[in-house]
Amino acid sequence: MKALFFSLLFLSFQAFGQPLFLVSDEEMLASNANKNFFYPKSAISPDAPKIELVSPKLDATISSPTQIQLKFLPKTPAITKPETFRILYGTFQIDITERLLKVATVTAQGINVPEARLPNGKHKLILNVQDSDGRVGSRLIEFEIK
C-alpha cells in the first residue's frame, strides 16, 4: 500500500509540470532488494522480431536523463505492431508502458525517448513487441544509472 501511495504521489507531481521519472526510487529499491528474478519458461520463436538497443551504450557510464533508442527488426514479410510494445520494470515486472508513452515516440521501426529519467542505481527492463504474424520478441536490458 505504501508503494502504491508513493506511486500515486509521484504521478501527481508529473501533472504539475515536474519531470516524469519512469520509475520511482521505491520501485527501484524494492526491485533490487529481491534477488529472485523471473525468467519466462517459454522459448521465443527464432522468427520473432528482434529488439536492438541503439542508445544508451551499456559499456559506458549512464546518467539521468538519458536517451533511450530502440530499433525493432521484424522478420520479413512481417511488420512490427508498435501498439503491442510493453516495457516491464525490475524483479516485479511493473508495467511502465503508459509512463514511457508519455515521453516517447513509438513507430513500427522502434522507439525514441529523448530524456528518460531514472533514479541512480541498477535497473532491469524487459521489452516486448509483437509482429503481424503474432510472434513476440523480447529483450532483457540491465544497466546502472550513476
Where on the chain are the PLM-derived regions?
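Short beta-strand edge segments in extracellular beta-sheet folds
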Residues: E142-K146
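Solvent-exposed loop/turn segments flanking beta-strands in beta-repeat/beta-sandwich domains
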Residues: K75-I87
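Short, compositionally biased P/S/T/A/G/V-rich stretches that sit at domain boundaries
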Residues: Q18-T66, L73
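N-terminal signal peptide c-region/cleavage motif recognized by signal peptidases
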Residues: S12-Q14
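Surface-exposed, short loops/turns at beta-strand junctions within beta-sandwich domains
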Residues: E115-K122
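Aromatic sugar-binding surface patches on proteins
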Residues: V103-N112
